Amino acid sequence: LMTDQVWHDDPKRLLFLLSRYKFVAKMLSGKEDVLEIGCGDAFGSRIVHQEVKKLTVADFDPIFIDDIRSRMEKDWHYEAKVHDILCGPVGRKFDAIYSLDVLEHISKDSEAIYIENMLASLSDHGVLIIGTPSIQSQAYATPQSVEGHVNCKDHAELKELMQRYFHNVFLFSMNDEVVHTG
């Protein structure tokens, strides 16, 4: 659904999307039980699925989850569930959670709920990866993207937010499909 529109509007953006999923897959390789929050149509989720034992994808929109289930292949089976992370934790603990391109759509007033509900769904020694465009990137974003991005941050703001919840915070940047530490 979403990815088809991306292919129509800006095909090179698919490279950026898939690069993010490849990064997550490498970071979470070997994890037992992984959750994606805000999966949309789950187009890139299969890349992560190759590297982890069990994957669950969740989105608040049942249209996406119904579409994912209708396209599910036997050899690529994973759980797809309707869940709004702003309404509560998922209900069980995961080794790792990732959420790509979600935070920027959540109001600043709700960002603590978003993070706290993911934390409540994360095992004590679990890993959380959050991917979000920087405020600086908005100068290059499409008008449609900018319209929905209500909570973009710079590196310092994102790090400060994450340090409220985590002892260890590592920030990465991305230009086109290249991930780096700058």
Question: Over which residues does each language-model region extend?
Answer:
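Short catalytic micro-motifs in class I SAM-dependent methyltransferases
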Residues: 101-105
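A generic structural signal for alpha->beta connector loops
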Residues: 52, 75-77, 125, 165-168
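Hydrophobic C-terminal alpha-helix "anchor/cap" residues
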Residues: 28, 162-163
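Conserved N-terminal segment of class I S-adenosyl-L-methionine
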Residues: 1-98, 109-116, 151-157, 174-176
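Short glycine-dipeptide loop
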Residues: 122-128
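Short aromatic-enriched loop/helix-cap "lid" or pocket-rim segments at secondary-structure transitions
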Residues: 94, 139-144, 181-182
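Conserved S-adenosyl-L-methionine
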Residues: 166-179
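Short, glycine-/aromatic-enriched active-site segment of Class I SAM-dependent methyltransferases
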Residues: 130-150
